[in-house]
């Protein structure tokens, strides 16, 4: 069973980063840094597939094995892959420090082999009042992505 994973984020533009995952008890600690962003919040999600053959679009929808509506990371009703937002400072750097109890590095909620995506816009956490909000949080375009792999 994997206890650590890593993801290198890359896209067509300047956005890039490295994200690390570590299983700690019943949670996964997600840490790292993303550069090249515009200042403010950006949706941050695990997507269904580890397929980046057509850029980030081939990663599919948010990882959602429980067939729930989109929500925030603290919500009961959420996709497994819904990790909310990362916030970039005025220099375009987002420091990631998330503890999540729904994603896993093993079992049916395993994110290993799936794609991590950082989005153009803020995730409205399913509270946007339209159908797209309940699917994607209106986070819009995928700026950078990478497949999550087992790490030492």
UniProtKB/Swiss-Prot annotation:
One of its GO terms (molecular function) is superoxide dismutase activity. Zn(2+) binds at residues 62, 70, 79, 82. The keyword Oxidoreductase applies. Binds 1 copper ion per subunit. Binds 1 zinc ion per subunit. Cu cation binds at residues 45, 47, 62, 119. GO terms for biological process: reactive oxygen species metabolic process. The modification Phosphoserine is found at residues 101, 104, 106. Disulfide bonds join 56-145. Its main location: cytoplasm. One of its GO terms (cellular component) is cytoplasm. It comes from the Eukaryota. Destroys radicals which are normally produced within the cells and which are toxic to biological systems. This is Superoxide dismutase [Cu-Zn]. It comes from Cervus elaphus. The gene is SOD1.
